[in-house]
């Protein structure tokens, strides 16, 4: 079975916790704090692998979590950082954020990697909080939570040429004729249910990859037939070979040509402008010459028409050499990845906002959420330090302006607190 789409959940490993520890050795008075830092959590990384063809590995498992970092130890020993979790995907996978739809990466080269969920940094041990006024801090930090998100993986085959046309036009027969691929071939529509790839090698040494796409019908861009599911696989192709069945009446052949091109334009207008060559197939059946003359009269000089027979091989070599020459003049396809935005150093902190759901006030700010998540809430000194931070950050003032009163519930990230007004 061919699986070209998957939805998965990924989570980077949490950082290891820093610990509270003090040096205790004979003859070493006031040894001081020596709690070590936690290790960094592992990241989840997608890596393109040319040896894979589908996303079937993600069919039976949807959740992937990297390991957390090791906790710190006494004697200033830092915890071990966790290994990254590497998930291998086929070359040609587009990675999107499932919530926003934003393109995160387009993996078009073997070995190309992208971090999709970064691991959290390790929490600092109490030795890192020594100051001139606090020589023996009794608090440390928890590890930073790893990033988590849902992803949509979408495989778009990497091929130079796409064979398009109505069902039963002879696309699979042509692919079998020009390459070593052996797609299923039968005399009924929709024999091809999955895209097939074949490598064409010419006598002059040139070669290119051809994709046979399941037949398109009217309404394919809206989900009719199998078209919508597989139209994505011709988005990367540089040349389209439109296979027409000349055993049909001339007007039907022309109507089929228009139907397929209309579907391409509706799905992606750029596809309709892509270089397209017409392969008038089944010339071994009587009456084909009249159909070719009819097509040339109606299509004019806009499209190069090659009379061929995929069954006998007639005219196929001339078609292939023309396609090879056309490919030599075209640039490689651009990646789907959205252009990288210009990086600007932020001098001001990220905006702090308060959202209200009944008597629950939700504090929104990445820095604040991270600080709360990394605080030992059962440690009195750590909580006092957090309260000072929240006040300096303006959280108290923002809550008062939002109408928070004593007894209200304050939610910061995954934690909830009861609000108490200052006297």
Curated annotation (Swiss-Prot):
Residue ranges occupied by any OBG-type G domain in the UniProt entry: 159-328
Location of this chain's protein in the cell: Cytoplasm
Binding residues for Mg(2+): 172, 192
Positions of GTP binding: 165-172, 190-194, 212-215, 281-284, 309-311
GO molecular function annotation: GTP binding; GTPase activity; magnesium ion binding
Domain annotation Obg: ranges: 1-158
GO annotation, biological process: ribosome biogenesis
Domain of life: Bacteria
Keywords: Cytoplasm, GTP-binding, Hydrolase, Magnesium, Metal-binding, Nucleotide-binding
Cofactor(s) in the UniProt record: Mg(2+)
Enzyme class, first EC level, given as a word: hydrolase
Ranges where the OCT domain occurs: 336-421
EC number: 3.6.5.-
Any single Gene Ontology cellular-component annotation: cytoplasm
Stored InterPro entries: G_OBG (IPR031167), GTP-bd (IPR006073), GTP-bd_Obg/CgtA (IPR014100), GTP-bd_prot_GTP1/OBG_C_sf (IPR036346), GTP1_OBG_dom (IPR006169), GTP1_OBG_dom_sf (IPR036726), OBG_GTPase (IPR045086), OCT_dom (IPR015349)
Annotated family: Belongs to the TRAFAC class OBG-HflX-like GTPase superfamily. OBG GTPase family.
PANTHER family according to UniProt: DEVELOPMENTALLY REGULATED GTP-BINDING PROTEIN-RELATED, MITOCHONDRIAL RIBOSOME-ASSOCIATED GTPASE 2
HAMAP family found in the cross-reference section: GTPase_Obg
Protein name, per record: GTPase Obg
Designated gene of the protein: obg
């Amino acid at each position: 079975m061919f699986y070209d789409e998957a939805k998965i959940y990924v989570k980077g490993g949490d950082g290891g916790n820093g610990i509270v520890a003090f040096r205790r050795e004979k003859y070493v008075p006031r040894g001081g704090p020596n709690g070590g830092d936690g290790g960094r959590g592992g990241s989840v990384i997608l890596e393109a692998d040319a040896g894979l063809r589908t996303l079937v590995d993600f069919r039976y498992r949807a959740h992937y979590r990297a390991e957390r970092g090791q906790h710190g130890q006494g004697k200033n020993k830092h915890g071990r950082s966790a290994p990254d979790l590497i998930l291998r995907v086929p070359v040609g996978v587009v990675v999107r954020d499932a919530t926003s739809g934003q393109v995160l990466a387009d993996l078009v080269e073997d070995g190309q990697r992208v971090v999709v969920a970064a691991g959290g940094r390790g929490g600092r041990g109490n030795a890192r909080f020594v100051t001139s006024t606090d020589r023996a801090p009794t608090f440390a930090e928890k590890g930073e939570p790893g990033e988590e998100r849902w992803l949509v993986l979408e495989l778009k085959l990497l091929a130079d040429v796409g064979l398009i046309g109505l069902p039963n036009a002879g696309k699979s027969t042509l692919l079998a004729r020009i390459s070593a691929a052996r797609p299923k071939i039968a005399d009924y529509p929709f024999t091809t249910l999955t895209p097939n790839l074949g490598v064409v090698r010419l006598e002059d040494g040139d070669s290119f990859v051809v994709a046979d796409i399941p037949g398109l019908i009217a309404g394919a861009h809206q989900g009719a037939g199998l078209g919508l599911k597989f139209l994505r696989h011709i988005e990367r192709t540089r040349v389209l070979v439109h296979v027409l069945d000349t055993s049909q009446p001339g007007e039907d052949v022309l109507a089929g040509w228009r139907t397929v091109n209309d579907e391409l334009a509706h799905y992606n207008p750029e596809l309709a402008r892509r270089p397209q060559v017409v392969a008038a197939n089944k010339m071994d059946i009587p009456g084909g010459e009249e159909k070719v003359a009819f097509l040339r009269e109606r299509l004019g000089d806009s499209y190069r028409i090659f009379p061929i027979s995929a069954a006998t091989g007639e005219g196929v070599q001339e078609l292939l050499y023309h396609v090879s020459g056309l490919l030599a003049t075209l640039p490689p396809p651009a990646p789907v990845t959205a252009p990288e935005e210009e990086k600007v150093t932020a001098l001001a902190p990220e905006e702090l906002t308060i959202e209200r759901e009944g008597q629950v006030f939700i504090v929104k700010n990445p820095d604040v959420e991270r600080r709360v998540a990394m605080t030992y809430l059962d440690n009195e000194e750590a909580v006092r330090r957090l309260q000072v931070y929240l006040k300096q950050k303006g959280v108290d003032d923002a809550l008062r302006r939002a109408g928070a009163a004593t007894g209200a519930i304050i939610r910061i990230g995954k934690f909830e607190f009861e609000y108490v007004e200052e006297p």
